[in-house]
Amino acid sequence: MILDGKAVSEKRLELLKEEIEESGLYPRLATVIVGEDPASQMYVRMKHRACERVGIGSIGIELPADASTEQVLEAVARLNNDPDINGILVQLPLPGGVDTTRVIDAVAPEKDVDGFHPCSLGRLFSGTPVFAPCTPQGIMTILDEYRIPIRGKRAVVVGRSIDVGRPMAALLLNADATVTICHSKTENLEDEMRRADILVSAIGKAKFVGPEMVKEGATVIDVGINQDEQGKLCGDVDFDAVKDRAGAITPVPGGVGPMTIATLMENTFRAAKLRTCGNNTVR
């Protein structure tokens, strides 16, 4: 079975558009991008287009590649203090001269729709998330939409990044899976992967996951965005080789990526609702 993230995202965005229209709210998202990296610019444009589609206002702050950490922090502070802005997204990665940790920590928790602030992650790891990071939460939505069982299943997450691997593991744990996180220092990696009922790969290595690493009938979630030797977009998973062995699998493109943006829109609307009702549970 192909887990069609694009189809799920289309459904979620249409439902969100209706919900926003019925709410009478006008959520607003601000993006901050530093430099002119083509991939980052493309991702930001996609996010603004999604905002327009569902009825979320958006503004973009563009800073030069040589911007200092202090300049980025000043931009974030202005957005924190703007009562008309509900969500703030700092497009990553930031240039090497900018302290990414300081910038992420500076975003007001109640506007942290990307889910990377320590307050957001702390709530996630404690089992009471408000804003979960968009990619892992989008994956959970795909699993839910396709009714993939999680409770009691063995889940293996390959990759321990703070934006995908660790929060993915936390969400699966919160859903009562038995979770293992693997990384570059894991011994007998293939053995660990073969035990997985749900296998999530987020390591950024083109076609790294082959059929010999996948349990028959497993659900395989491919978070990777890479290029193969021919320059063609591909994931961490060798899709053609694995699809017949897996019980369910996300493609690249069209799998996890669209759900990341849909979840960002949902988080932004949630931030607007929380502000309207005066809910301060984010902190």
From Swiss-Prot:
Subunit composition and interactions: Homodimer.
E.C. numbers: 1.5.1.5, 3.5.4.9
Protein name: Bifunctional protein FolD
Protein's pathway: One-carbon metabolism; tetrahydrofolate interconversion
Organism (species): Methanoculleus marisnigri (strain ATCC 35101 / DSM 1498 / JR1)
Family: Belongs to the tetrahydrofolate dehydrogenase/cyclohydrolase family.
Reactions that this protein is recorded to catalyse: (6R)-5,10-methylene-5,6,7,8-tetrahydrofolate + NADP(+) = (6R)-5,10-methenyltetrahydrofolate + NADPH; (6R)-5,10-methenyltetrahydrofolate + H2O = (6R)-10-formyltetrahydrofolate + H(+)
Residues the record lists as binding NADP(+): G159, R160, S161, S184, I225
Pfam families assigned: THF_DHG_CYH (PF00763), THF_DHG_CYH_C (PF02882)
GO biological process, one term: tetrahydrofolate interconversion
Keywords from the named record: Amino-acid biosynthesis, Histidine biosynthesis, Hydrolase, Methionine biosynthesis, Multifunctional enzyme, NADP, One-carbon metabolism, Oxidoreductase, Purine biosynthesis
Record's function text: Catalyzes the oxidation of 5,10-methylenetetrahydrofolate to 5,10-methenyltetrahydrofolate and then the hydrolysis of 5,10-methenyltetrahydrofolate to 10-formyltetrahydrofolate.
Single GO molecular function: methylenetetrahydrofolate dehydrogenase (NADP+) activity
One Gene Ontology term, aspect cellular component: cytosol
InterPro entries: Aminoacid_DH-like_N_sf, NAD(P)-bd_dom_sf, THF_DH/CycHdrlase, THF_DH/CycHdrlase_cat_dom, THF_DH/CycHdrlase_CS, THF_DH/CycHdrlase_NAD-bd_dom
